[in-house]
Amino acid sequence: MPLTRGRFAEYSGQTVLSRVGKADAVNLEPSVDAWRLTHRCSEYHLIYGDNLQAIVIATVGSPSIHVLLESITQYARDLPVYISSNSLELWAEVRGRLKNNRVVFRPNTATNFGDAYNSIVSYAFQHGDYDSLIIANDDVVLSPDTIEKMKADYKYVGREFKVGFLGARSDYVLPAQNIRVAEQDDVFSALKWESELHIKMTDVIAPIFAAISKEAWETAQFPSTNWYSDNIICHDLCKAGYFHFVSRGYVHHAGSQTVGNDFKKCHEEPREWIKQHRPDMYEVFYGNT
């Protein structure tokens, strides 16, 4: 049972942007189904300004966060970082690594993914002057051009669409974002699939490293669950007229360092919450049981 229908289905999975050389971005007239981004990301960023103005992380102490912080130190040092955690040692490490005063620490008193991120993301939007920011899992690692590509992609699709999530590609994530999953008639060249050079529209984004605007965040937030929180927020945003996209930007994902790899347990945990609070979505995940 698809989570989105009608207006969304006709675009879902299509390539809407590709990078094929150099040109003047100002003169581009994108169409809905096949856009061509024929300029370098750095040039595009200078033309269309700034976005994705902070990184927000919630953690329960996964060792992977130390690797994430090192990659932020190397590739996103200038972005403010908001962290929800109960570790004072981690707070000291973050300030020491990034060596700036734009690190905000908040206690993490939540018992699930949804509530943890709702709290820290809402705090960042309320106390920071941000139009958009990046939600990050604590077990991902940035590449040198992750932020650059996502900034360019987010600004570009935002010219034509109400953007819900723009999610990074990864190696341990939903199929639409997964670099291990080739598109139909894909070509493997220069150590990657040709489709990785494209933005595409999709039904659901796993926001392991994903951009969202303040406007979209005020429209829908995560349910109080671990699993299926992504599906539900994406569904709610689609119903409100937003579209979700897969970026060309990439992050490595260690995978399930927080909720674990017992998939049957993860599937069953949110059953009663969804049945009680989101009965409209219950059948999507659990059928008639």
Where are these predicted regions, by residue range?
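Acidic donor-binding segment of Leloir-type glycosyltransferases
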Residues: 73-106
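Short beta-strand-to-loop element that shapes/binds the nucleotide-sugar donor at the catalytic cleft/hinge
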Residues: 164-181
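Conserved donor-nucleotide/metal-binding helix-loop-beta segment in metal-dependent transferases, i.e.
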Residues: 145-165
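C-terminal catalytic/acceptor-binding lobe
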Residues: 3-38, 223-289
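Glycine-rich, basic loop-to-helix element that forms the pyrophosphate-binding segment
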Residues: 108-124
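Short, well-formed alpha-helical segments that are part of the catalytic scaffolds
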Residues: 61-75
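Short beta-strand-to-loop acidic/aromatic patch adjacent to the donor-nucleotide binding site
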Residues: 130-141
